[in-house]
């Protein structure tokens, strides 16, 4: 089964509400939808970045250029079922650009799994679970609004784990915000925070213990991504778990963080690792080092979220669950099928491949004008 064509489309999908982070406020998400055609079948994938190149080194525009001009010409005519060969060829031809590679890798996995009438989870080893506890992100910037949102989520049994974005205000203001939320949800929910690199080491060393005292269970990426030493010291000094996100940008970074046990948990993201196989490798590094895996998100659409669900469903352990909330943050979906959240968990989609199919009318509607 030879690859006949690889096409890319940039779509811009508005969010239901602004998402305030330490570095930007997200009003829309841009994705590159990839379709790989072979043997009468089409596999779909997705690449993107939260807030564009502000968060990382890629954007929808660079992803499309890299695929159209370098990766697609390289892979057309190759065996669509040889996932290892495709991955090696992409890595040899293009340095970095992991989200672009991930989009193709996901599409090839979807294509092969559909051809074999398997789910991607079954293709890569089989499921350890068919649903995953899912955290909701509270990022309106308004304490009362965030509390109302959390209480509604608990009442409707959608979420009982909440991640609060910090770093846009002073640490003292953030702490009061957290205390109010923790008090409001009580023992009905857990609270974690994401600083998105917003603090230096000194600030983090002062405020993380106070967050722990307030009842926070996990602190995500408190310091800049390159400061592995600060992460290690903060992990050693504090009882609350430290989670690496932006620092986890490659298999080699996973090795360095694991070697020094610089963090307690890894936030896995397919786009950060270059695809499914590399994400599984990072999870294996974490397991070997006694570091927990966490199901991270790039605010993926239903396509990327389904792919992540298939990967996370195969992992031995996910003690902190996942945060695959992209489809519910967006104002619309790009697939014919919805994903399901029930009893505080997101459920693995049924069917072959990803278990979701593109809604081509929606894709056309959100396609960026040339």
From Swiss-Prot:
* Cofactors (names): Mn(2+)
Q: Can the keyword Isomerase be found in this entry's annotation?
A: yes
Q: Which residues form the signal peptide?
A: none
Q: Which reaction does it catalyse?
A: 2-[(2R)-2-chloro-2,5-dihydro-5-oxofuryl]acetate = 3-chloro-cis,cis-muconate + H(+)
Catalytic site positions: 165 (proton acceptor), 323 (proton donor)
SMART domains (UniProt xref)? MR_MLE
Summarize where Mn(2+) binds, as residue positions: 194, 220, 245
Cross-referenced InterPro entries, in alphabetical order? Chloromuconate_cycloisomerase (IPR013370), Enolase-like_C_sf (IPR036849), Enolase-like_N (IPR029017), Enolase_C-like (IPR029065), Mandel_Rmase/mucon_lact_enz_CS (IPR018110), Mandelate_racemase_C (IPR013342), Mandelate_racemase_N_dom (IPR013341)
UniProt keyword terms in alphabetical order: Aromatic hydrocarbons catabolism, Isomerase, Manganese, Metal-binding, Plasmid
Q: In which pathway does it act?
A: Aromatic compound metabolism; 3-chlorocatechol degradation
Sorted alphabetically, which CDD domains does this protein's record hold? MLE
Enzyme class, top EC level, equals isomerase
Family designation: Belongs to the mandelate racemase/muconate lactonizing enzyme family.
What protein am I looking at? Answer: Chloromuconate cycloisomerase
Q: Record the organism.
A: Pseudomonas sp. (strain P51)
């Amino acid at each position: 089964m030879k690859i006949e064509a690889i096409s890319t489309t940039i779509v811009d999908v508005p969010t239901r509400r602004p998402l305030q982070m330490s570095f930007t406020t997200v009003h829309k998400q841009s994705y590159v939808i990839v379709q790989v055609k072979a043997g009468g079948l089409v596999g779909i994938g997705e690449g993107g970045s939260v807030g564009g190149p502000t968060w990382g080194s890629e954007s929808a525009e660079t992803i499309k250029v890299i695929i159209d001009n370098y990766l697609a010409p390289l892979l057309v005519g190759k065996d669509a079922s040889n996932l290892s060969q495709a991955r090696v060829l992409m890595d040899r031809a293009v340095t970095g650009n992991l989200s672009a590679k991930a989009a193709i890798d996901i599409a090839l996995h979807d294509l092969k799994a559909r051809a074999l009438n398997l789910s991607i989870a079954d293709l890569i080893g089989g499921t350890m679970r068919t649903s995953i506890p899912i955290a909701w992100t509270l990022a309106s910037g308004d304490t009362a609004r965030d509390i109302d949102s959390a209480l509604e989520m608990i009442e409707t049994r959608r979420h009982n784990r909440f991640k609060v974005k910090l770093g846009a205000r002073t640490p003292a203001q953030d702490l009061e915000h957290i205390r109010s939320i923790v008090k409001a949800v009580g023992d009905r929910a857990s609270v974690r925070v994401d600083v998105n690199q917003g603090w230096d080491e000194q600030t983090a060393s002062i405020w993380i213990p106070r967050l722990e005292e307030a009842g926070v269970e996990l602190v995500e990426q408190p310091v800049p991504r390159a400061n592995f030493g600060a992460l290690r010291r903060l992990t050693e000094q504090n009882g609350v778990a430290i989670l690496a996100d932006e620092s986890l940008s490659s298999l080699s970074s996973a090795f360095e963080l694991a070697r020094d046990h610089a963090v307690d948990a890894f936030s896995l993201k397919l786009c950060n690792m270059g695809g499914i196989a590399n994400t599984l490798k990072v999870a294996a590094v974490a397991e070997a080092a006694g570091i927990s895996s966490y199901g991270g998100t790039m605010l993926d659409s239903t396509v990327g979220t389904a792919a992540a669900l298939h990967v996370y469903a195969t992992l031995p352990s996910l003690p902190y669950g996942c945060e695959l909330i992209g489809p519910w943050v967006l104002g619309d979906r790009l697939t014919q099928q919805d994903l399901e959240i029930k009893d505080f968990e997101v459920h693995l989609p049924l069917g072959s491949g990803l278990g979701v199919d593109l809604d081509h009318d929606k894709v056309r509607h959100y396609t960026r004008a040339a």
